[in-house]
């Protein structure tokens, strides 16, 4: 019975704590690479595509 009472309060906190730790790790890694895994590559591809279209129009 005692072990059950000890585990009950901890259970709800473990999930959110793990999620927060994973998010912090992701942020640290993205900063160390100077690249946000999803946002930056998609932004660059769109930017280069627009540049390429503008160059074709100017020619």
Curated annotation (Swiss-Prot):
Q: What is its main location?
A: membrane
Task: Give TM regions.
Answer: 13-35
Give the membrane topology, semicolon-separated if more than one.
Single-pass membrane protein
Compartment(s): Membrane
One GO BP annotation is: transport of virus in host, cell to cell
Instruction: State the UniProt keywords alphabetically.
Output: Membrane, Transmembrane, Transmembrane helix, Transport, Viral movement protein
Q: Which GO terms describe its cellular component?
A: membrane
Its biological purpose: Cell-to-cell movement.
UniProt name for this protein: Putative movement protein p6.6
């Amino acid at each position: 019975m005692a072990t059950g009472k000890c585990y009950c309060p901890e259970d709800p906190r473990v999930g959110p704590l793990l999620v927060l730790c994973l998010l912090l790790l992701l942020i640290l890694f993205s900063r160390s690479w100077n690249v946000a895994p999803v946002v930056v590559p998609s932004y660059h591809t769109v930017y280069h595509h627009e540049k390429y279209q503008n160059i074709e129009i100017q020619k």
